Regions:
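A structural motif shared across PLP-dependent enzymes of the aminotransferase-like
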Residues: 53, 108-121
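Mid-domain Rossmann-like dinucleotide-binding core that forms the NAD(H)/NADP(H) cofactor-binding site
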Residues: 137-192
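Cytochrome P450 core scaffold surrounding the K-helix E-X-X-R motif
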Residues: 42-47
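Extracytoplasmic/periplasmic beta-strand context in beta-sandwich domains
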Residues: 18, 100, 114-115, 136, ...
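Residues located in well-ordered beta-strands
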Residues: 2, 16-21, 33, 84-85, ...
Length: 192
């Protein structure tokens, strides 16, 4: 199968198209054929890994670098979100079957910039809403996960007013939708 790989940190020039082995799902995994995957800040950070890219204290840079790889990346296929179709399911998988359209968030494991990927059934994977295309569904997981965690920290209650700064971005757009439709808040969004 084809995948976009990188073996060193740097600019987009370190990315290249390569043939890699097609994964085989374990008993608790699905094999998904990737139809769409976005490029986001996590991909940029993992590929470039410059300290200036991190929005964190310098002391956290060291453990992050050890986690991702000191001299070269430990994970060499980027892509933290995807939408695609289940091609095969491990023998203990019960929630998904071949042919199901799914979307998923892979987190630091990444790997979605490939034709196929294995995802644990109990991972952050769900049936893709029928009214969304693959490209639309692939962009949802990261923004929704971040937005819901921020709204929970805010202890938002029905009827409360909330201002969402950056309402046109991936996280902000999801925060607006979740605050209004899930929490019942009065939402004002700003961007610029």
């Amino acid at each position: 199968m084809k995948a976009v790989v990188f073996t060193e940190y740097g600019s987009p020039d370190v990315l290249r198209l390569a043939e890699v082995a097609k994964p085989t799902p374990k008993d608790n995994e699905i094999l998904a054929r990737v139809r769409a995957t976005p490029v986001n800040y996590g991909d940029l950070t993992a590929r470039d890994f410059a300290h200036s890219q991190f929005n964190m204290p310098a002391l956290l840079y060291l453990p992050a670098r050890l986690t991702f790889g000191w001299n070269k990346p430990k994970v060499n296929i980027l892509g933290g979100e995807l939408a695609g179709d289940v091609e095969a399911a491990g023998k203990s998988v019960t929630k998904f079957k071949p042919g199901d359209a799914v979307f998923a968030y892979l987190g630091m494991n990444m790997g979605a910039n490939a034709e196929y990927i294995c995802i644990p059934e109990n991972g952050m994977v769900a049936i893709k809403p029928a009214n969304l295309g693959y490209a639309e569904a692939a962009t949802l997981p990261y923004g929704a996960i971040m937005a819901i965690s921020l709204l929970k920290k805010a202890s938002l209650q029905p009827g409360q007013k909330i201002l969402v700064n950056g309402a046109s971005g991936g996280i902000g757009a999801m925060a607006v939708q979740l605050a209004k439709h899930h929490y019942g808040a009065q939402v004002t969004g700003v961007c610029g």
